[in-house]
Amino acid sequence: MSMRFKFMSRRALLGGALAAAAIPLTARGQEGRDPANQEPTDVRIRIGFNKLTLTATLYDNPTARDLASLLPLDLKIEDYGRNEKIVHLPRKLTEEGSGPFGNEQPGDLCYFKPWGNLALFYADYRWDGLIRLGRFDNGFEPLLVRGEYPVRIERI
């Protein structure tokens, strides 16, 4: 009986190990894409307000693709705190496969899940509840201009 118990334990252990190894594979999105991907794509956007322009390259993740599907947008950009500007979107974006990320830095374009808004960072930040959508291409100096302005976001 103890031999059978050992055999069952090994079988259960092996099955558990195989299942644990398969979990990261099932967490991947359709077509083998990693939903939390931080790799840039060829999708670029332009953000224009107050006669200033920023460009950003979007990452290959479901949330960034959902944002791109909404473009062009004419909304409002405003200051929030001392490190970002925000843009309220017309609807929430998909959060499919999102997860935490590290190496936060100024120049990140993110989506804030609780409020459903874009967060454009020009200073250091660390906050849970964000999905990184991409990075600004050539700096973020226009974000330093304080105030609230009409903003146009479009694909380029």
Language model regions located:
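Second-shell loop/turn segments in exported
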Residues: 51-57
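Short, Lys/Arg- and Gly-enriched loop/turn segments at beta-strand edges
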Residues: 117-123
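Compact, glycine-rich, soluble single-domain proteins
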Residues: 74, 81-99, 103
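N-terminal secretory signal peptides and thylakoid transit peptides that target proteins
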Residues: 2-19
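Well-ordered alpha/beta subsegment
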Residues: 135-156
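C-terminal segment of N-terminal export signals and the immediately downstream linker at the start
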Residues: 24-48
